Amino acid sequence: MSFKMTQSQYTSLYGPTVGDSVRLGDTNLFARVEKDYATYGDEAAFGGGKSIRDGMAQNPNVTRDDKQVADLVITNALILDYDKIVKADIGVKNGYIMKIGKAGNPDIMDNVDIIIGATTDIISAEGKIVTAGGIDTHVHFVNPEQSQVALESGITTHIGGGTGASEGAKATTVTPGPWHLHRMLLAAESLPLNIGFTGKGQAVNHTALVEQIHAGAIGLKVHEDWGATPSALDHALQVADDYDVQIALHADTLNEAGFMEETMAAVKDRVLHMYHTEGAGGGHAPDLIKSAAYSNILPSSTNPTLPYTVNTIDEHLDMVMITHHLNASIPEDIAFADSRIRKETIAAEDVLQDIGVFSMVSSDSQAMGRVGEVITRTWQVAHRMKEQRGSLDGDSEYNDNNRIKRYIAKYTINPAITHGISDYVGSIDEGKLADIIMWEPAFFAVKPDVIVKGGLINPAINGDANGSIPTSEPLKYRKMYGQLGGNMQGTSMTFVSTTAYENDIGKLLGLKRKLRPVHNIRKLTKADMKNNSATPKIDVDPQTYEVFVDGEKITSEPATELPLTQRYFLF
């Protein structure tokens, strides 16, 4: 016998369904459900009097050996991803996403492709948003505490370089040489994130570069503080082509060895990841931003200039001076800092993100960027651009799906593609590591509710351990069992070069984490950047620094207030 209920009743039980819209935090953005995998009336839900009970939505006969039986089911989740905004159950097995579909007991329920059995645990996601774990590809490994801060913001993968609080690490995202790379690979065993390290890219002797790739580096960083010359860049790219790794470039702010055009001539048609492409974080002054028009350049922003606000310019000068070891008593050092901070190019950066010219967002952690704010600032930009520029083509009232898919790609799938790890992480897709972030919609992009890392909860908001219920105050992020014993190694990956993987670097160093090789990098173009592949003509006026896209001046007004800010940090 069928039972009818109102849409509001249904939503309160099982979350939104097709046609419903969900507001993201206190932004002006709304996600509309495009598809619901549920069979109405056969929804799987856990709790007293609910359907996931023996002989009902839980099958009493199956064992874990059945390939369709999940270790974990996340029920009735609203999935926001670069290619879908859907309501579904998520099945996890052996720490990987097994299936996105309909969970339950196929003996009595229709359309079940994820079986719940006696060996299955449940996380209830009714009314909650689920996203893939974020990927930050511009990390200065200056402080190991960054990992926990990032994890609690929804980031599950860090790529970059460093060795701790050395001047080189604080400035240049470089882990130089085999000895340092091996030490950092060992250190990664105790970090709760997926990790990949970049080596130093400055050497005309290819052996000095190749030995870093053999030691596990997943790419090389060419940075102006070590000398971002056309020669250094050319040699690094030659090695990258030989070993299928990525080159990350912090270009030559002072134009000492040439201008932007000379750098691009040295790059030729070879792919590289251009860091902080607007230029405030470093790079050819004043026109590095033009490089985003090239089809072989994969451009990213770092978060200190995102979004553009009334405070952005003032805070940046001190950041540049400290990060790059400059001396305030030397006029040339002051001029160096001043050359990087241009309100005209910063004002254009948000727009270039919004129209899909800039493809990624990263942090630049403790080196002019904030490791725990990649996700928050990405969505603040999306809000500001809708506020100033209106809806994107194809979006409408209470439906910002196109803009949502564009912006979520910037810190999930696109950085994964750029660094050759998209087979493993970067989206909510079958076969990928179960790095899954759950959000209460009101707290979206600020404070995740539950972080699932490699199939295990770690961490989660939880109450006083002596409380009679799990919500006894103080509610705060607490480490879970995913960070205890051997689970730190079992739920995270360390990414290494293919040559290091094939030569069993894990055995050499006694590593226990899952090692995975980076690959499919050197043939990438900007067309591979999901929802962010535009290559218009970009010009910069050398006198005024105004930015023009296809002949049209682009700019934005500095924000005086933003969503996802103070009201979320009173407790």
Curated annotation (Swiss-Prot):
Keyword Cytoplasm: yes
InterPro entries the UniProt entry points to: Amidohydro-rel, Metal-dep_hydrolase_composite, Metal_Hydrolase, Urease_alpha_N_dom, Urease_alpha_subunit, Urease_AS, Urease_asu, Urease_asu_c
GO cellular component: cytoplasm
PTM entry text: Carboxylation allows a single lysine to coordinate two nickel ions.
One biological process term in Gene Ontology: urea catabolic process
PROSITE patterns associated with the record: UREASE_1, UREASE_2, UREASE_3
Binding site for substrate: 223
EC number(s) recorded for this UniProt protein: 3.5.1.5
MF term (GO), any: nickel cation binding
Cofactors (names): Ni cation
Positions annotated as active site in the UniProt record: 324
UniProt cofactor note: Binds 2 nickel ions per subunit.
Localization: Cytoplasm
Top-level class of the enzyme under EC nomenclature: hydrolase
Protein residues bound to Ni(2+) 2: 221, 250, 276
Binding residues for Ni(2+) 1: 138, 140, 221, 364
HAMAP family for the chain: Urease_alpha (MF_01953)
Protein family: Belongs to the metallo-dependent hydrolases superfamily. Urease alpha subunit family.
Subunit organization: Heterotrimer of UreA (gamma), UreB (beta) and UreC (alpha) subunits. Three heterotrimers associate to form the active enzyme.
Name assigned to this protein: Urease subunit alpha
Naturally occurring in which organism (per UniProt): Staphylococcus xylosus
